[in-house]
Amino acid sequence: MTDKPSKTQTSFLRRLLVAYLIDTGKNTVPLIIEATGMPRRTAQDTIKALHEIEIKVEQFNRGEYRISDWGAVNRNWIKNNFTHVCSVLSYPYKME
Protein backbone atom coordinates (compact mmCIF):
# COMPACT_ATOMS: atom_id res chain seq x y z
CA MET A 1 0.00 0.00 0.00
CA THR A 2 1.41 3.37 -0.98
CA ASP A 3 0.09 6.42 0.77
CA LYS A 4 0.21 9.84 -0.76
CA PRO A 5 2.76 11.93 1.16
CA SER A 6 1.31 14.55 3.49
CA LYS A 7 1.79 18.27 2.93
CA THR A 8 3.95 18.33 6.05
CA GLN A 9 6.23 15.62 4.65
CA THR A 10 6.54 17.20 1.22
CA SER A 11 7.19 20.64 2.69
CA PHE A 12 9.93 19.28 4.94
CA LEU A 13 11.57 17.21 2.20
CA ARG A 14 11.38 20.13 -0.25
CA ARG A 15 13.25 22.30 2.24
CA LEU A 16 15.90 19.64 2.76
CA LEU A 17 16.30 19.20 -0.99
CA VAL A 18 16.59 22.92 -1.70
CA ALA A 19 19.17 23.34 1.07
CA TYR A 20 21.15 20.42 -0.32
CA LEU A 21 20.99 21.81 -3.86
CA ILE A 22 22.22 25.19 -2.63
CA ASP A 23 25.06 23.49 -0.76
CA THR A 24 26.11 21.49 -3.82
CA GLY A 25 26.29 24.42 -6.24
CA LYS A 26 22.72 24.75 -7.51
CA ASN A 27 22.62 27.94 -5.50
CA THR A 28 20.37 30.30 -7.43
CA VAL A 29 16.62 30.23 -7.98
CA PRO A 30 17.03 29.60 -11.75
CA LEU A 31 19.39 26.66 -11.10
CA ILE A 32 16.97 25.16 -8.56
CA ILE A 33 14.11 25.53 -11.04
CA GLU A 34 16.19 23.94 -13.79
CA ALA A 35 17.19 21.04 -11.54
CA THR A 36 13.74 20.25 -10.15
CA GLY A 37 11.12 21.85 -12.35
CA MET A 38 9.52 23.50 -9.33
CA PRO A 39 7.79 26.84 -9.91
CA ARG A 40 9.82 30.00 -9.25
CA ARG A 41 7.61 31.11 -6.38
CA THR A 42 7.90 27.70 -4.71
CA ALA A 43 11.70 27.86 -4.94
CA GLN A 44 11.77 31.39 -3.51
CA ASP A 45 9.34 30.57 -0.70
CA THR A 46 11.24 27.40 0.17
CA ILE A 47 14.53 29.30 0.48
CA LYS A 48 12.82 31.88 2.70
CA ALA A 49 11.39 29.11 4.92
CA LEU A 50 14.66 27.27 5.56
CA HIS A 51 15.15 29.16 8.83
CA GLU A 52 11.98 27.48 10.15
CA ILE A 53 13.87 24.18 10.32
CA GLU A 54 16.99 25.90 11.69
CA ILE A 55 18.96 25.83 8.44
CA LYS A 56 20.74 29.15 8.03
CA VAL A 57 20.99 30.41 4.48
CA GLU A 58 22.80 33.55 3.38
CA GLN A 59 22.44 35.49 0.18
CA PHE A 60 25.64 36.72 -1.38
CA ASN A 61 26.51 38.28 -4.70
CA ARG A 62 23.45 38.74 -6.82
CA GLY A 63 20.87 36.05 -6.22
CA GLU A 64 23.30 33.41 -5.01
CA TYR A 65 22.77 31.56 -1.76
CA ARG A 66 24.90 29.49 0.58
CA ILE A 67 24.15 27.38 3.61
CA SER A 68 26.07 28.72 6.61
CA ASP A 69 24.67 26.31 9.21
CA TRP A 70 22.73 23.05 8.86
CA GLY A 71 21.48 23.26 12.44
CA ALA A 72 20.19 19.87 13.60
CA VAL A 73 19.80 18.58 10.04
CA ASN A 74 22.17 15.84 8.90
CA ARG A 75 23.31 16.88 5.42
CA ASN A 76 24.55 13.35 4.73
CA TRP A 77 21.05 11.94 5.22
CA ILE A 78 19.85 14.05 2.30
CA LYS A 79 22.83 12.98 0.19
CA ASN A 80 22.22 9.30 0.98
CA ASN A 81 18.45 9.52 0.44
CA PHE A 82 18.49 11.87 -2.54
CA THR A 83 16.64 9.49 -4.88
CA HIS A 84 13.94 8.84 -2.29
CA VAL A 85 13.45 12.57 -1.63
CA CYS A 86 13.12 13.33 -5.35
CA SER A 87 10.72 10.42 -5.76
CA VAL A 88 8.44 11.55 -2.92
CA LEU A 89 8.41 15.07 -4.36
CA SER A 90 7.98 13.83 -7.96
CA TYR A 91 11.05 15.79 -9.05
CA PRO A 92 13.10 14.41 -11.93
CA TYR A 93 16.42 15.73 -10.70
CA LYS A 94 19.48 13.49 -10.96
CA MET A 95 22.87 14.28 -9.47
CA GLU A 96 25.56 15.01 -12.04
Annotate each language-model stretch with its function.
Residues 23-28:
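Short capping segments at the starts of secondary-structure elements
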Residues 51-60:
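A short, conserved structural fragment
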Residues 59-66, 70:
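Short, Lys/Arg-rich nucleic-acid/phosphate-binding segment
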Residues 31-35, 51-52:
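Alpha-helical residues within the helix-turn-helix
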Residues 1-3, 7, 68-96:
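Long, low-complexity, charge-rich intrinsically disordered regions
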Residues 11-18:
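Short, leucine-enriched amphipathic alpha-helices that occur as contiguous helical runs
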